From Swiss-Prot:
EC number: 7.6.2.-
UniProt source species: Caulobacter vibrioides (strain ATCC 19089 / CIP 103742 / CB 15) (Caulobacter crescentus)
First-listed, main subcellular location of the protein, grouped into a coarse class: membrane
Keyword annotations: ATP-binding, Cell inner membrane, Cell membrane, Membrane, Nucleotide-binding, Translocase, Transport
Gene name as annotated: lolD2
Protein name: Lipoprotein-releasing system ATP-binding protein LolD 2
Amino acid sequence: MSDPVLALRGLERVYKTEAGDLPVLRGVDLDVYPGEVVGLIGPSGSGKSSLLHSAGLLERPDAGLVALEGRDCSKLSERARTRIRLGTVGFVYQFHHLLPEFSALENVAMPLTIAGKSRREAEARARELLESLGLGHRLNHQPAQMSGGEQQRVAIARALANRPKLLLADEPTGNLDPATSTAVFQALYQVCREQGVAAVIATHNMELARYMDRVVALKDGHLELQRV
């Protein structure tokens, strides 16, 4: 078996509240491998977003190890963490956050041009991703001209533009109807498998969880393997 893209060991996260310390992650361990899509479930407030933010180097855990491609990132400087995050991790959120004045092609190409790619190279990669997600006919459409499901697929393409090794998605289909949610998830799953991207997807949708390679549940700050 290949080495994990993401490895969490003994992850702990505690928030300060007026009532005292609120632990949301208590010694979480998790490995995610190339091309594996892992579902993360749990009630609101259980710590799903905290786990994703820690895994994606957006937050520092209070204790524990976060390793990306075998490198412990827990004690690196913010500059080093940012560099690794930009090169290794893609994010998808419940809201697509597309720039309304740009086309689908331009939205997806933008992270590549920011990273120093030529316009030609950026647009070629953007076109490849959009076509793989069934949006080859929507390249020049702005977000307002697309359905919610199409907008979210553009957001997925944008997250994958820089060829990340890890994709973290926080309720990526939460604003979509059931049929559209399934279609978007299937497109996401397929492109992650094809490109060997490890993915962790937080969701409340148990129907979608059934399609994932593995599902883990956050309960009382601990991860448990979930049968679906």
